[in-house]
């Protein structure tokens, strides 16, 4: 990797992380450590059994539960949960799930200042970031504020070990995207570089392992640890074209969050590769591939993940509007953002062919 400037700024995000198999058992202790005693439990319909277990662990600290977390954090869902929070006089939320449930917890914190304890069941990574994305009338917007950074995150590999392989693949590549874009962020620094490369290595190793032994605890631990490190990257530096496109496609066209990240990442990397060859070389080395964009596409394809926007249901006739939305406002990126360049990127991602080396 080419030498970076010796000048940089690094700000650590203040959060407590508990990592290990079976650590879900600490949830009550962590709520009490925050000095809280009335918990609104957040989950989703597909995690009812796990939510029941956590509810039992909380005992009398539990006061109410909302199982309606939705993708892309629509404000109308937040309003329903907010009413429950206030009616219950809850002073803490415990969120179980992936990015949707974490997003709901953050949205509640943004509105009330309520404390958050997060138990991730996927590899989203948003649980260790001060970033909140919300969807209002079909448009997804993001903001960054420490007011939404969860106080405590409990990483229990038992909660993600049975994550179905297709969901695990998409979620892991979502995490990988955080590490990749952190490497070429204008805010990049040696601390984040170290996290990003370690995350890329662990996630690539985990993606390969999912194919051969999806139930292996070591593989699932690699993925969970990689997602945590990648999330730390996301929470520390600004992101670029990949994240902008994914937010546009999710908010405006309703595409699923993690699969969209999975499809777009190799093409966003290819789009920027000529401007940051040092970054791509370092990532390729960490992931043990010869070419970073093509190597990521191979990892996804070999693991059975989606490789085209067409497969996610996006119509070719949607690409022009997507390009317009993604270039409405300027944002930082290694390669200059133009409407034609983004339209070409989207076309490549829609077709789904392997990026050239």
Swiss-Prot record:
Associated pathway: Aromatic compound metabolism; 3-chlorocatechol degradation
Listed EC numbers: 1.3.1.32
Swiss-Prot/TrEMBL catalytic activity: 3-oxoadipate + NAD(+) = maleylacetate + NADH + H(+); 3-oxoadipate + NADP(+) = maleylacetate + NADPH + H(+)
GO molecular function: alcohol dehydrogenase (NAD+) activity; maleylacetate reductase activity; metal ion binding
Keywords carried by this UniProt record: Aromatic hydrocarbons catabolism, NAD, Oxidoreductase
Keyword Oxidoreductase (UniProt): yes
SUPFAM superfamilies, per the entry: Dehydroquinate synthase-like
Pfam family, one: ADH_Fe_C
Top-level lineage group: Bacteria
Role, per record: Plays a major role in the degradation of chloroaromatic compounds by channeling maleylacetate and some of its substituted derivatives into the 3-oxoadipate pathway. This enzyme converts maleylacetate and 2-chloromaleylacetate with similar efficiencies.
Family label: Belongs to the iron-containing alcohol dehydrogenase family.
Name of this chain's protein: Maleylacetate reductase 1
